[in-house]
């Protein structure tokens, strides 16, 4: 049986439409495009079976398989909607308003039953803030939770008339339910106050009382807000703690730290080698590793294991986001927003680079559920010009491109979701698949050069040195040597070093054919400053030769020693330029 073809919803100032995914890229034959210019919100259900949207007059809900209209709700002012995981409940939210005389407004958060045949309202709440407005359901819908007046209220089996449990701490600011099957776990965040630290605690529902009820606890002082991210197996949470102000003055955008908290009680601060903001944190589908993009530009990207040890370092580059494929076998590192849209597509198993496409001016990225295609889009209001979307194969081939008409805007694009297992992971290919569209982006305008420098060679000077990707795993798996073996190895190394020193002390041969003499004849230029530069360059080159000998003998060099070797060509060029000018 052929795998299904994911739909793509496209919402903008020209209305809303459903587009067939790869390989067709045509409008759905069954869905009738809604031309309303006021489509405020659209949403697929978690399993992708239903699709709903509000066009400024009514909410429509259709079946994705044949676009049959299932429900219509007369709710013209709705600006957000959400489906429960099993499509039992539809939650809608509209802006809270009070009466002209100051009287309390009507409930603006509505819950509707979609399973009873005829849609009906089951509960209404007052939810003043749009932030975190939607109730949180467990995947089996046995539990639903809301944050009400700094405490979490729990409902069971979608019975919203009775509060089954409450989680009350000092001031609960945010919470996250774990994914997956029962038992359900909840992570709660309480901000610090009056000198007390902020903290995140993990609980297992419904065990909220008692001194030992918390599964884990992590406190920290530098936190005005946090973002909590469960892994797919609900065994651990990553907490990105952020402050609004960086007291060190290193950044305008505050300070971030990353914390790891496991349900078995373990916790740790994830040590990031480079200073600067944390741009993105994402779990792999396998729940055993996560990727972090961090540091002042050019940013670093590193994969860590559950011990918070680095596995692989992707080096530095213009990036601020990371996206694992739904199957977890491919990782995309990208730089969107104020960056040029460069993407790096990596094979996660081999940590091998697959492709490096570029999506200029992109503000949105999403994997197709099949794990083979990705979409990049330029959406309003982030960018109001050049709106449109592109669909790529992960090998870097541009397969489809759509530009919205002039004076129109694109607001949202989203793939139709599918349950796990519908699209199994396929073998990764490195050869670009064929495509009809050119993938080459227009070259950016060259940097301005003053007239006096336009006929001179371009300097190779850089503000920073780019760091290459490297594995962070231990290089050797051999058993540790005994004390006697270590002693003998040290003796051999000392003997070898003494021998090399004695060789360097010997006078240089006068053979004119020996162009690689270790002690080249000193050049007297008559300029003390130039002589000093030449002497220093020769000293550095001599040290590099010694490092190369150690490397060829099998000794593992430090990172800074490898960087010195990589600069040999630059130093040789500088020395040549100085000696030519003599």
From Swiss-Prot:
This protein's GO cellular component annotations are: cytosolic small ribosomal subunit
Stored InterPro entries: TIF2A, TIF_beta_prop-like, WD40/YVTN_repeat-like_dom_sf
What superkingdom does the record give?
A: Eukaryota
- SUPFAM superfamilies cross-referenced by the UniProt entry: DPP6 N-terminal domain-like (SSF82171)
* GO terms, molecular function: mRNA binding; ribosome binding; translation initiation factor activity; tRNA binding
- Biased composition of type Polar residues is found at 510-522
Question: Coiled-coil segments, which residues?
Answer: 482-580
- The region called Disordered is annotated at 436-533
Gene Ontology BP terms:
regulation of translation
Q: Where are the WD repeats?
A: 21-63, 73-124, 273-314, 358-402
| PANTHER family according to UniProt | EUKARYOTIC TRANSLATION INITIATION FACTOR 2A
**Could you tell me what this protein does?**
Functions in the early steps of protein synthesis of a small number of specific mRNAs. Acts by directing the binding of methionyl-tRNAi to 40S ribosomal subunits. In contrast to the eIF-2 complex, it binds methionyl-tRNAi to 40S subunits in a codon-dependent manner, whereas the eIF-2 complex binds methionyl-tRNAi to 40S subunits in a GTP-dependent manner.
Q: What is this protein called?
A: Eukaryotic translation initiation factor 2A
